[in-house]
């Protein structure tokens, strides 16, 4: 997918790196992806989805995988014990990274013999604290905080069917609810669609000068609360899908295509895989990049400002249909 707002850069002769200010050392003007436009953000989320599926393949026949959603209960819905322990939605209605961190500690403590890995996002819903749609509220800019995560090498053995969503079966798990403690939970299957759902947090995140005013909540008493922006965290050491890459690198390079079980074969290799190849075989990576430049030159008409704007409008309309209903 193209960047719709590419930046102008130059390749440094001595280092081979990219600079954004011309100098005597620099040569060969080139366009560099901005990293912030819709095209870049969709690429970023798709690359994460690829890696999530690749990581899940490593555990499919051992511990299995789970796609989970963790939500908060209202303070008014608490039992006495839950109220005393603070297991309800924060007064600020903000995401809280520590809540998920503590959840993972409790989960791993419950299953000490399992090496449970994860990829998770924190995001906000569409219903605000004043019980209306965010888009219809004159005060709120975000909705109810909640979390989505893919758990690798773990499934729950007490799943209860609670419904379906767009043909996907959804479950509850008393064990998961007990470990989470803060409210309702859902469990689903790990698919390329659910992986992309977790990774598309970036489409909602506001950056730059607009962020300061966007991530503010006003409670019923008129107090201001500054909110944690949407975010992701994941298991490291090794990185997500590192072991899969080590086994199947020849399926990606030098063809420069990425096979994703259940989803097909994709052009556009995750940058993480490129970094791994650069460490092992920098000459192959340079050759692949040169071939990409040849392809871009041969299809230059597809990358004119006018053409990019047309493609942007189409992609924006398509992305609006990616409803976050899980």
Model-derived regions: residue spans:
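Short beta-strand element of the conserved SAM-dependent methyltransferase core
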Residues: 70, 149-153, 310
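DNA replication initiation on ssDNA origins
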Residues: 1-53, 293
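Signature for HUH/AEP ssDNA processing cores
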Residues: 43-140
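A structural signal for well-ordered alpha-helical segments within the folded catalytic domains
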Residues: 35, 97-101, 196
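Conserved His + Asp/Glu catalytic blocks
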Residues: 126-132, 139-145, 151-289
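Residues in well-ordered beta-strands of folded domains
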Residues: 38, 69, 119-122, 186-188, ...
């Amino acid at each position: 997918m193209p960047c719709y707002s590419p930046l102008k850069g130059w390749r440094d002769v001595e280092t081979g790196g990219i600079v954004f200010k011309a100098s005597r050392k620099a040569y060969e003007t080139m366009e560099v992806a901005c990293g912030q436009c819709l095209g870049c953000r969709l690429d970023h989320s798709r690359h994460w989805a690829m890696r999530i599926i690749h990581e899940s393949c490593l555990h499919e026949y051992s511990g299995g995988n789970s796609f989970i959603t963790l939500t908060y209960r209202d303070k008014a819905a608490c039992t006495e014990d839950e109220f005393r322990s603070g297991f309800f939605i924060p007064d600020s209605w903000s995401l809280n990274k520590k809540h998920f961190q503590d959840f993972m500690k409790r989960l791993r403590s419950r299953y000490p013999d399992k090496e449970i890995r994860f990829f998770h996002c924190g995001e906000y819903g569409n219903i605000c604290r004043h019980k209306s749609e965010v888009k219809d509220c004159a005060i709120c800019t975000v909705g109810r905080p909640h979390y989505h995560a893919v758990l690798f090498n773990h499934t729950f053995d007490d799943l209860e069917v609670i419904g379906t969503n767009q043909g996907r079966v959804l479950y509850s798990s008393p064990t998961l609810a007990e470990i989470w403690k803060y409210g309702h939970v859902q469990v689903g299957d790990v698919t390329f669609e659910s992986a992309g759902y977790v990774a598309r947090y970036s489409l909602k995140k506001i950056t730059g000068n607009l962020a300061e005013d966007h991530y503010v909540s006003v409670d019923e008493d008129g107090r201001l609360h500054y909110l944690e922006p949407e975010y992701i965290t994941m298991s490291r050491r090794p990185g997500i899908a590192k072991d899969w890459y080590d086994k199947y690198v020849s399926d990606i390079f030098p063809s420069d295509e990425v096979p994703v079980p259940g989803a097909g074969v994709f052009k556009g290799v995750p940058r993480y895989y490129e970094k791994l190849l650069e460490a092992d075989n920098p000459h192959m990576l340079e050759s692949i990049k040169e071939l990409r430049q040849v392809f871009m030159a041969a299809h230059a008409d597809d990358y004119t400002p006018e053409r990019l704007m047309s493609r942007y409008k189409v992609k924006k309309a398509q992305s609006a249909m990616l409803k976050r209903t899980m």
